[in-house]
Amino acid sequence: MTIQDKNTTTGELSYFETTLLLYLKESHPHIADAKALVRARADEAAGSYERAIRDGLSVTQALELADAVLYQDLRFSRFDTVFEVVSEWFPEVRPEKRADFCLKVLSPAETVFSKYPIDDRFESSPACHTLTVELTGFIQSYIEQYGV
């Protein structure tokens, strides 16, 4: 497996840039256009991969190390959490409007998210359930105040 770590002369994205960009578009759309972040993380991940291969690790192990660098502090997605809450509890937000609504409510919902120590392991913590309950109430109030 060849992993391209630099942009080609044709302007194509590297494997790590493409992988991260697709993930950001799906789970962190509010930062998907952060080109400097994508470039820096892709470069770091490629470097990690290359060092791991030089150190004799398998391709699978090297990719695991590179992924740890690529997705650091991005594993928990505020957008995905809002989207799941809206999908489960708010049928008045039609499926075709759901992503746009979630993007709209994401910034105001930061008042809820900021109360929690969110990191890559947060989703498996007991506090995640509490956040989800609080977020549901916040979104209900938001809809009552501003509508869908």
Predicted regions and their residues:
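C-terminal alpha-helical interaction appendages
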Residues: 2-148
